[in-house]
Amino acid sequence: MTLFQEKHFALFGNPVGHSLSPPMHRAAYGNMGVPVTYEAYRVETAEEIIPMMKSLGIEGASVTLPFKEAVLRYLDDVTENARTIGAVNTIVNRGGRLIGENTDWIGLVRDLKDHVQIKGKTFAVLGAGGMARAAVFGILHEGGKPVIFNRTGERGEALACAFNCQALPWVALDGFRADVLIQTTPVGMAPDINSSPLKKESLANFHYVLDAIYNPLTTMLLRDAEEMSCIPISGVGLFVYQGAEQIRIWTGLKPPVARMRQTVLDALMKE
């Protein structure tokens, strides 16, 4: 008989129907042998999340697009890292207070370290949303140099100013060289799988290309990257590692990372 009391966790976002967070988390808790439920809830505004957590007795939540930044103002508190990043993808109930945390940056760093050394490398970061903010934070934390590119120049400049790093105009990507390209925008995400944020030829100046999108497993950007002799990195590792850190925060237990990864890969192969 387990000493672990039943807990209820959830995913909040819009949309959530495509998300593999529920099967990944359920597989993890099943493997761990703990009584946990994990459900997905589509909400229209970030403001709805906190009342739903309280009314449904949800003790931990994953927050996905488009609410990672907007949800901050409704929380009782946020961790120092989440406050610095300016985005929350994880909420934990600590003694009745709902605390915001960010595990996206941890997922990104762990995934990058599986492929490349971060310290001393230059990273071109596409986008200026919550995932981009986590990426910039993680790269700087590990001694890398991020350079931000965003189609809306003002948002890119604001992000660069917040982290004291560089932002360049989107058109400058064609001639920009970096060790790693990190793509954090939704362009290319299912069902829009035949879109890419960049022309294939623009990838010639990068060694590694990481797409934060995990569905599809191989985005058009990653297919183009391979054709341009870059090393492609799918968003699966990032997704699994950030989820594993959520589980550690919520339960205090070691998550079964290999089981989680296999669950995600199996689900993607069926699509």
Question: Residues of each region from the PLM?
Answer:
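Phosphate/diphosphate ligand-binding glycine-rich loop within oxidoreductases
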Residues: 2-116
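Glycine-rich adenosine-cofactor-binding loop
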Residues: 13, 102, 112, 116-140, ...
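Conserved beta-strand positions in the Rossmann-like core of class I SAM-dependent methyltransferases
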Residues: 39, 147, 233
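Short glycine-rich anion-binding loops that position phosphate/pyrophosphate groups of nucleotides
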Residues: 63-72, 129-131, 186-189, 215
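NAD(P)-binding Rossmann-fold cofactor-contacting core
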Residues: 142-163
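Rossmann-like adenosine-cofactor binding region
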Residues: 161-232
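Rossmann-fold NAD(P)-binding glycine/threonine-rich loop
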Residues: 207-257, 261-263
